[in-house]
Amino acid sequence: MRKIMYFGGTCQSPALPALIHPPAPPLQPSLDIKPFLPFPLDTAATVNLFPNFNAMDPIQKAVINHTFGFPLPHRKKQIISCNICQLRFNSDSQAAAHYKGTKHAKKLKALESMKNKQKSVTAKDSAKTTFTSITTNPITTSSDKTESTAGTQVIARSADMRKSSEVTTELTSNAEKSLTAAVAAGNNSSPPTETEEEKAKRLLYCSLCKVAVNSASQLEAHNSGTKHKTMLEARNGSGTIKAFPRAGMKGKGPVNKGNTGLQNKTFHCEICDVHVNSETQLKQHISSRRHKDRASGKPPKPKYSPYNKLQKAAHPLGVKLVFSKEPSKPLTPRILPNPLAAAAAAAAVAVNSPFSLRTAPAATLFQTSALPPALLRPAPGPIRTTHTPVLFSPY
């Protein structure tokens, strides 16, 4: 009964037909779409599964985040930048190195100088405004005073205002004239009054030698040097270096303001006997060791040459041959033996020639006895060679 009642109760419920019907066939997904299973997780619940999650390494946190989808806390990167140089840095050390560098210091100095210039300009503008207000104050005060008078004095008030305006215009015109005159006088008087030495001290530059210095002491040391003095002597023509005008260069080209008086000239150094054609060559010669040694009195160094005339005069290389005027004796009586000399003398006596050579019997070349004829004959043998007569001579 219980089972029947149970089934009967269930059959009477309206939800039963829905359970009894067979399920609909599932839809076949397409080949391109892959089925994904949703895996919703509560982040707080899953973090509780890993009690040491906050103490884990960053790599382990990244793996868990990739697997379970934990959102890692995103830290905002601190941006370090320099607004003056328009640069961004990755770390504090880079920023500190930039702030200590020369590039940042130069830009900061330029910015400060611009600010100072702007301040000076604003100060000048404020001074001009105060000056104009001072000049206009008498007019306003006079007008205020005249406004307080009665209506019968209108003509006198207008006359006073005209007079005051004329006075102010005269004052302003006189001031402008005095300023322009002072400026013109200053411009006209400054070039002739400023000498070359004063200009060099002001600019820290020697226009004669074309040398720039950093202080007045360096300029004095340069002026007391030998190079500057020799250049002055060359310009004045009072020293050992003489200046001569270059041929064909008169009246050519405009005259420069920084003319040193040494352009378009040739120079001759009397100490070294050297001619140069320009100012730069003169400077090079003055700074050379040769000129310095000659100016200090040192003897010139001998140049290497295989054909030096001085060495030839002191140490002759050749051998002088002296020829006597007397005729030399003939060599034949000395070379030939005594019998030949005797035969020649006998022939001369036989001819009875007045120009016969009478020679004293000379000693033989070899003091030994004459060779026996047996040695001069060829040795016996099957081969016989004809021997020429042997003549002994010292050469």
UniProtKB/Swiss-Prot annotation:
Gene3D superfamilies associated with the record: Classic Zinc Finger
Listed GO MF terms: sequence-specific double-stranded DNA binding; zinc ion binding
UniProt keyword list: Metal-binding, Nucleus, Repeat, Zinc, Zinc-finger
UniProt-listed SUPFAM superfamilies: beta-beta-alpha zinc fingers
Region (Disordered): 282-308
Family annotation (InterPro entries): Matrin/U1-like-C_Znf_C2H2, Znf385, Znf_C2H2_sf, Znf_C2H2_type
Places the protein is found: Nucleus
Residue spans, zinc finger Matrin-type: 80-110, 204-234, 267-297
Protein name as it appears in the record: Zinc finger protein 385D
Species in which this protein is naturally found: Rattus norvegicus (Rat)
Higher taxonomy: Eukaryota, Metazoa, Chordata, Craniata, Vertebrata
